[in-house]
Amino acid sequence: MGCKNLLGLGQQMLRRKVVDCSREESRLSRCLNTYDLVALGVGSTLGAGVYVLAGAVARENAGPAIVISFLIAALASVLAGLCYGEFGARVPKTGSAYLYSYVTVGELWAFITGWNLILSYIIGTSSVARAWSATFDELIGKPIGEFSRQHMALNAPGVLAQTPDIFAVIIIIILTGLLTLGVKESAMVNKIFTCINVLVLCFIVVSGFVKGSIKNWQLTEKNFSCNNNDTNVKYGEGGFMPFGFSGVLSGAATCFYAFVGFDCIATTGEEVKNPQKAIPVGIVASLLICFIAYFGVSAALTLMMPYFCLDIDSPLPGAFKHQGWEEAKYAVAIGSLCALSTSLLGSMFPMPRVIYAMAEDGLLFKFLAKINNRTKTPVIATVTSGAIAAVMAFLFELKDLVDLMSIGTLLAYSLVAACVLVLRYQPEQPNLVYQMARTTEELDRVDQNELVSASESQTGFLPVAEKFSLKSILSPKNVEPSKFSGLIVNISAGLLAALIITVCIVAVLGREALAEGTLWAVFVMTGSVLLCMLVTGIIWRQPESKTKLSFKVPFVPVLPVLSIFVNIYLMMQLDQGTWVRFAVWMLIGFTIYFGYGIWHSEEASLAAGQAKTPDSNLDQCK
């Protein structure tokens, strides 16, 4: 009896979401177009990083070769962006990576993904609000900070911030109110701020190339003079790549986080007029624009000023001052505030929508899924998430939580890539995701014979009898995916994830052992890499789904596997404290899921009700 109950619990945790076949039905307002999505993605991604991150990475990690670091980071981000793009075309519903996981790998993994996305967006909102407050305070002479230190100091070092940030709370309250008014209104404000930000960045790039000198990319150790009093700081060996290629890779790992934010586009599936095409285009276009901006600003910055003289906290004003053009700091300040505003809006925009999607599915408390009849926005979810973010911005220094935000985002990226890999090789399922990917015109052209054929394939009437053997794995006879080939891919994907984790652990924790040629490290690394290649080859040999989508990830399974590897490798770079905080957050989440979500899940209600026959499912999709 105990084994039976345990098996039933396992089936509950791995049940997959049945997606409604109707593309048009949505309780939210469909008012966004492709341009709105590009503006949202650029605004969310092209935030504070372009004004601060470039200086820190150039001085401490890569030097002028930061342009290559941004290129590598952009390529890694595009891998994740392509996977998001395919799922945006396949499942144009609100929920982003949470929904993608739900329809592919099951309820428990979906809850883990959604729970970590909520954490990432809340921390992102709080940290950017404090950065906006600090930037504005710096611009007007720091009166807000001085007042807080004199009258509102918090005596809890190591636990709370030195002073509460009232202005950050006010900013969050204003933007929360803006988001509750409606998507169209908030999208308009976002477009205005994004346009100003892009114009300022164009000014910076053009000025940098005009005022800069290529000699700053050809420096030697003899030029290390402006900071010669600081003997503890290392400036590398000069030249274009002063810290070597390892410094470029280290800089790329940091620059990767500058591209985080495009995933907010995927949360707008039920608010976009043509989601199957608009979401993939919005993701890829926003990443391309952001890369051009990062590349141009970092090149201009290192051309205007020697990399070892850059100010880590405010590199751009320092570079213009170095060129004798101190007045340009006001343009930089305006651009910085606009960038922080769009980044803040980009963090706040998807936050209530993920909560809404999870609450509507019954995994979070149902009242969070209520929609305002006039504005067609999830008002309660918006206000609740905004209140939590405001409290965190008011009380906490968020330096230690930045990595925690990254771990949640990287986990979501990894799961989306795994979902693309698995779903591409599964048999067609008209009552789930397959019909969701088809347009209305295509559905009209599908006749009953095609649907019956797909149904027979699902229920096991395969054109070729399949038995488990090495030949059936390496050289399958079926042209279309079957239950057997889908099972092979599922098992292979799980094994591949374990092997990639092993490779990343050895590469990060056993770096010195590998460098010294220690036998165990070399053996484990070599064996794991070879097995990864073998398993990837097995997946590649399986028949691929012929479902027509408006966008598909190219070079499957190689690109999703590369995306998973990059994301897990970056997760392994995070410190132990981050993993401990991650475990605490997950403990809270599991308490909610096993105490409430698993029993109130909409999929559980469907399973407890009448079981739908294949014929009824076909009728629903017709």
UniProtKB/Swiss-Prot annotation:
Modified residues (Phosphoserine): S616
Known tissue expression: Highest levels found in the testis and bone marrow. Not found in the liver.
Primary location recorded for the protein, binned into one broad class: membrane
Similarity remark: Belongs to the amino acid-polyamine-organocation (APC) superfamily. Cationic amino acid transporter (CAT) (TC 2.A.3.3) family.
Pfam family, one: AA_permease_C
Function: High-affinity, low capacity permease involved in the transport of the cationic amino acids (arginine, lysine and ornithine) in non-hepatic tissues.
Signal peptide extent: none
Gene Ontology molecular-function annotations: L-arginine transmembrane transporter activity; L-histidine transmembrane transporter activity; L-lysine transmembrane transporter activity; L-ornithine transmembrane transporter activity; virus receptor activity
Protein name (record): High affinity cationic amino acid transporter 1
Catalytic activity: L-arginine(in) = L-arginine(out); L-lysine(in) = L-lysine(out); L-ornithine(in) = L-ornithine(out); L-homoarginine(in) = L-homoarginine(out)
Subcellular location, record wording: Cell membrane
BP GO annotations: L-arginine transmembrane transport; L-histidine import across plasma membrane; L-ornithine transmembrane transport; lysine transport; positive regulation of T cell proliferation
